[in-house]
Amino acid sequence: MKNLLTIASLWLLSLSLAAGQDASKTSSLEDQIKKLEQNWAQATVKEGAAAVDQYEADDIIATDPSGRVTNKTQDKLDLSSGDFKIQSEELSDVRVRIYSNTAVASGTNIVKGTYKGQDINGKYRFTDTWVKRNGKWQVVASQYTKVQE
């Protein structure tokens, strides 16, 4: 009986240690995705179309606040043509959920910029889906909604 209690205690201890490691790993991945979100926003302002190649997957599906669905090629064209001009992006309240090699990030973005000459300044809510492929995190889906204030 004493051996059974010892074995059960060791088993429970190993489970709690494993759970702690999983929580630590998840927290680290959440921080990594938050950093990628910040980097993507900054790169879009500084690098324009070059940021698309770095952060967007080839098969991305993106929906803008008007409901227009775009892909990587269209996003690059919008930025390189000057149709989409971003002066600043300020992310806040970014929350991340990890699902194995997939992460979902949601937050707020204060944008200053124009699209085809129209002012798009404002507060937006976003949801981005990141997938880790070949050791690299990239966005496969992105959706922005303008917050009505």
In which residue ranges do the predicted regions lie?
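A beta-strand edge to alpha-helix "cap/lid" segment located at domain peripheries
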Residues: 4-7, 21-55, 59-149
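Bacterial N-terminal signal peptides
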Residues: 7-16
